[in-house]
Amino acid sequence: MPIFSYPSSPLIPTLTLLLSLPILFFLGPNILPPRRLTITAPDELDDLSLFQKAIALSKSQSAPKSHLPSTKSRLGSTSTFRPKIAFMFLTNSDLHFQPLWEVFFNKTQPNLYNIYIHADPSIRIKPPTGVFADKIIPSKRTQRSSPTLISAARRLLATAMLDDPLNAYFALISQHCIPLHSFNYLYGFLFDIHKLRKNLDYLSYIEILSESEFLWDRYNARGENVMTPEVHFDQFRVGSQFFTLTRRHALKVIEDRRLWRKFKLPCINVESCYPEEHYFPTLLSMEDPNGCTKYTLTRVNWTDSVNGHPHTYYPPEVSPQLIHTLRESNSSYSYMFARKFSPDCLNPLMEMADSVIFKD
């Protein structure tokens, strides 16, 4: 039997709660998982309006060919007879490697490419300059492990299709990507191969894999069998988030409604949720598998990935030998881009831009 006893009082739990609130305020974001972004109805309607305009324009015109007459871009640039490459930068931070990309673009004719930037509007980003100036498209928030990254890529595709009918290839680029060859080398690779194929359709360069130890968990990330009947497990694919698509495949992406209904659903198992790595490979594998190479032009090192992020290269690793190694592939083609590089790699990369990177 206790010698002393204290009267119970509601004051003690009240004080405890009040003292806990500041702690929860400061530590909560680091303890609780972030709320996943979902696709809102207004955002969906905005995108559908954009997609419908791009679809209507694309279907009213022929696919870009070398004999097309000169046209004028909706952003004001004058097009030429030759097909173009649309470089689409998807970023949620500053474009740290803009100076390197400037060298890449400045070594070729400005009428052979267009640039489009989707920059997360919730993050303050240093305004791009030079050839990147005024290239940010109307953008919306993005978040990892959410369908917003799919929406951003589709938004870029539709904008580029609507802007210039001569955009024949659409290369999705990360802010952590660097070029591994000159623009002329890339251009020749994409379009000379087309000539060698005797005017057959262009091929899309997108990784499409049907085997992965995590595939089943990712397929059920939204709940068991939620993806059916639109996508059965044997149709589910995985691939790189970054790709180089033909115009006809870009059109298929923005026309799609059926698969999007499932891929836009929020994930229950966030750790297995990488929608952007599955939507594009799955859709194009189902729609036109023979029109895709099933490999990407972007080299990524997954040997020591951390929390779903690939190996990040730092300045001590940057060398001419690294560039030559990153170009190598298991096929007859060469990789054209590489990621992931830390921002402080810019200086050593710029030092060997002319002598190594753009010397093909």
Place the predicted regions along the sequence by residue.
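ER/Golgi luminal nucleotide-sugar-dependent glycosyltransferases, focusing on the catalytic module
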Residues: M1-D360
